[in-house]
Amino acid sequence: MAKIILPLLFGSIFINVSCNNSGTTTTTDKESTNKMATEKSFDLDKARTAIDEDNRKFMDEFKRGDSVALAAHYAADGMVLAPNAEAAKKDALAALWGSFIRSGIKELKLTTTDIAGNDEMLAETGVYELYADNNKTIDKGKYVVVWKNENGSWKLFRDIFNTSQPPTK
């Protein structure tokens, strides 16, 4: 008798569980479907063009010495994580960029090497060069910027950079 009841019990449990789960869509499935639809409509090349244009403006404003305009490129909750300094948040960004300009840096050149991400956030990696008077290179390094989409515009959310030069003795 136990040989007959045990398989029937397991069979009925399996059928009951299978029937309860078939034809239903979980929240996770719906979120996945929505995310895939959003990702399909996201154009990384278009985002790259926007980032390239923003970087061109940033370099021009740096060359003009406009630290207030440089700070305006950042998201409301954006910050710069510069070497040998505390993190600079929105209210301190103009002062930070102003200090770089006053230190004798005349020009900043940014070269993007990679961009990856989605319609909400992008990660840009690249290299930079800093120039003094007479186009003299004073530093070369690398950077990572996390870009945040704020109301349809890409804004710098996290900006970190460091030199590729050997330490000075």
Please place each PLM-identified region on the residue numbering.
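A short hydrophobic beta-strand element
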Residues: 120-128
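Sec-dependent N-terminal signal peptides
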Residues: 5-13
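Short, low-complexity N-terminal intrinsically disordered segments enriched in polar/charged residues
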Residues: 19-68, 72, 168
